[in-house]
Amino acid sequence: MTIGSFRDSYTSLGFNAFSLELDFATGGKTGDGSFASGYGYPILGVGLTYNTLSDVKFRSKNGHYSDMITAYGTISRDLLRTKRLGFGYNIQLGLSYSSGYYDAQTNSANWFFSSPVLLYAGGGGHLTWIVSPRLDLEAGIMVKHNSSARLAYPNGGLNYWGGGLSARYRFSSSRPPRANVFKTQAVRNLEKGWSYEIYAGGGVHACAAEWRALVKTVPRDELSTSLLRKWPMASLSFDAIYRTGGRFALGATVDGFWNSNTERLEWADRILYSEEEVEASKGYSPLSAGIGFVQEVFYRNAALYVQEGIYLYRHMGIRGEHGPLYERAGIRYYPPSLSPFFISVCIKAHKFKADYLDFTLGIRL
């Protein structure tokens, strides 16, 4: 159970947070070569957080938040552990719900998110006092983010930070060995070497330029997020990855993308910019291609997937939709019963701003 206080980055006014988690403490024998020992025996869990966001007052009268409920998964790992103290980091991912989202008439100042269901990510550090074999007291600091992930617009994103105190009761008195916090080991029964993967994906995108054009052309009393269309996106990729036999794999990728909104983007550019600027641009093509570096970090049959790429071909009007670089980050799952197939979900972004959520299905060759 955690009680915390946070501040959002826009109003700088505080609100409170209350969390409840159910955690699983991974274990194993010293030197067993398991995933748990390979990661220093992390704590995995699920939780619920209630944020009193309605306490935050906007500078504009036509703006407000509502209280938010978040369901998330979490991983917590100690980097340093003694008999009485532990110090480490926490990572949380999940979904949030809030009824106080953007509305052109009643909540126009809240341009941070435009849908009731939001993506959530958080990370931070903790200091733990081991009071007894079954009781821990913990102080921590977290940085958190919520956004509509381009499923709706406007989507400035809500960023907030703060700290809290928590108490953890353990149903078992057993604890991981202190000697293995830094001396993590390779995981047995995993083959080293190259693997090759092909995967295809798709998602839905809401265009920021289209929204700016609507704001400029539609009367305020008629402006609504329902006017903003959701555009299908698709991707096809090939990865060549080398796995070390333990937690990590590193490689290269070739990507192809299809955007369905190029005609609408050209319409928006002709409203936002001059005809001369539009005609001088590189044009508008639904197809783009790029290459990049990828890394996977494994835990059992799941992996955290991160990619940094550069476009070799992309014609998306005046602004080029954020430049030549792009990022993808998400989670992959390799179900043993469906081998060699895998599934994944990732966020595609430009300059670390979300473009769309990509759901993929792939095969390992």
Question: Residue ranges of each PLM-predicted region?
Answer:
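Membrane-embedded beta-strand positions of outer-membrane beta-barrel proteins
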Residues: 44-46, 89-93, 123-125, 137-141, ...
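Outer-membrane beta-barrel biogenesis signature
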Residues: 29-37, 171-195
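Transmembrane beta-strands of outer-membrane beta-barrel pores
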Residues: 1-3, 26, 48-54, 93-101, ...
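Outer-membrane beta-barrel translocator domains and adjoining extracellular loop/strand segments
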Residues: 5-10, 56-62, 100-108, 149-156, ...
